[in-house]
Structures are given as C-alpha cells and as structure tokens.
Amino acid sequence: MPIHSALWSSAIDTAQSLKARLAIIHLVHEARGLDVNPATIEKFRRAGDLESVKVLEIIHLDEITHVTCGHRWFTWICEKEGIDPVETFRKEVREKFNGAVKGPFNEADRAKAGMGREFYEDLVGEADVRAKLGVGYESAAIS
C-alpha cells in the first residue's frame, strides 16, 4: 500500500526533528486524509455499505483531531522558538517531504483543524531532488 509506505518513509525521514515530524506526518499525511475521506465515504454510501460509512465517518472525525493536535503543537513549538509557523511549516515540507502537497483540499475541515490555505497551497517537497543532488547531506564514502 503506497500510502503506508510513504507514511513510514516520512517517519524515518523526520526522526531527528519534532517540528519536521509534526509538519510532515500530522499536517501533510493526516491532513490529506481530511481531503480524501469525504469522497471515500460517499462511494461507500452510494454502494449501500452504511456500516462502512459509519466507521469512515468516525475515522474522519478522528483525523480532524489528529491534524488539530499536530497544528497546535507545531504552532506552540514555533512560538516558543520565536519563528513563524507558516514559514517554518513550508520550509520543513520543502526540505523533508517528497512531492507536491496535493489537492483538491478539504478547506473546511483543514480550517477546523487550524490550517489556513497559506500553509499548504502551492507547496512542493524537494526531499527526493535534494537527496539525488546531495544537497544538504553529508557525502558518505563507499568502501
């Protein structure tokens, strides 16, 4: 399952930084759940699988809580360090995430979680490009 692979890869890539972990795991991956869950719920509803709809609705509400907590802690850390949360989030994503932060976005549920559009619009992670170019990484000698 590619989504789980991406989640675990991001967990490894952000292991050394709480800010990066909160930004990438909670405010990118889990926020993406806010975007895709409503369409998934609707597909199950159209198929008549109301039991799955109920479960997915609970999961969706839980996802809003995860993003809210991630946003709260990320913002708190940034305030303690005297840095701008939006600029810091965008920097963390550019440096430690691979690929675009994809829409369409569920702006209403992202806003409920505290994430305004300034966080995620027109944002692309460059981690894979940086790794391939060796930018920001120590070169390792191969024996």
Model-identified regions with their sequence ranges:
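Non-heme di-metal
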Residues: 1-143
